[in-house]
Amino acid sequence: MNLVGSYAHHHHHHHHHHHPHPAHPMLHEPFLFGPASRCHQERPYFQSWLLSPADAAPDFPAGGPPPTTAVRAAAASYGPDARPGQSPGRLEALGGRLGRRKGSGPKKERRRTESINSAFAELRECIPNVPADTKLSKIKTLRLATSYIAYLMDVLAKDAQAGDPEAFKAELKKADGGRESKRKRELQQHEGFPPALGPGEKRD
């Protein structure tokens, strides 16, 4: 173009410190605004493609669907039923097997946990001198039960009379309990039987 050529020509003279051409001050203006005017002419095409894809969709090649069609298809596959609280049919079908497995897992785990807690509650009831308002952890319950079993075995070995539960001291910080006397009576009734079966009772 003449514009670029004239600019290069005058810029060459200016670089070598020749006396400036009278038209030189005007060259910067067409050089700066010339490309801008060309970009301004090309910009509407980019705007129509970037900012309004719905309008530009018919111009896409026939090899693939326009984006708007793909979006409509994706929306239709989930449909208006995809509200909170309602699963789309496709997702429900895909996650059905896993969902059933997950659903049965927590129920089974919950039953197992309830069974364990029930067994620990029964075990706590068997330990004497534990206040009714005392909450024992599972590990503490096991340790107290183990020590109580050891105590009972020791009682049998020593051939004690009726195995007085007062001799067993549950290692707790709280010493008093409302149901303590009831437990003592129950244990005294139960304790009357095991010593009779002990190995030291067989005497001639």
Curated annotation (Swiss-Prot):
Q: Which residues carry this modification: Phosphoserine?
A: 115
UniProt xrefs under Gene3D superfamilies = Helix-loop-helix DNA-binding domain
- Record's GO cellular component terms: nucleolus; nucleoplasm
Q: Where is the composition biased (Basic residues)?
A: 8-22, 98-110
The keyword DNA-binding belongs to this UniProt entry's keyword annotation: yes
State the Gene Ontology BP annotations: heart development; trophoblast giant cell differentiation
Task: List each copy of the bHLH domain by range.
Answer: 100-152
Q: How is it modified after translation?
A: Phosphorylation by PLK4 disrupts the interaction with MDFIC and leads to translocation into the nucleoplasm, allowing dimerization and transcription factor activity.
Q: Which residues carry this modification: Phosphothreonine?
A: 113
Q: Which PANTHER family match?
A: BASIC HELIX-LOOP-HELIX TRANSCRIPTION FACTOR, TWIST, HEART- AND NEURAL CREST DERIVATIVES-EXPRESSED PROTEIN 1
Under what name is this protein listed? Heart- and neural crest derivatives-expressed protein 1
Q: Which gene encodes it?
A: HAND1
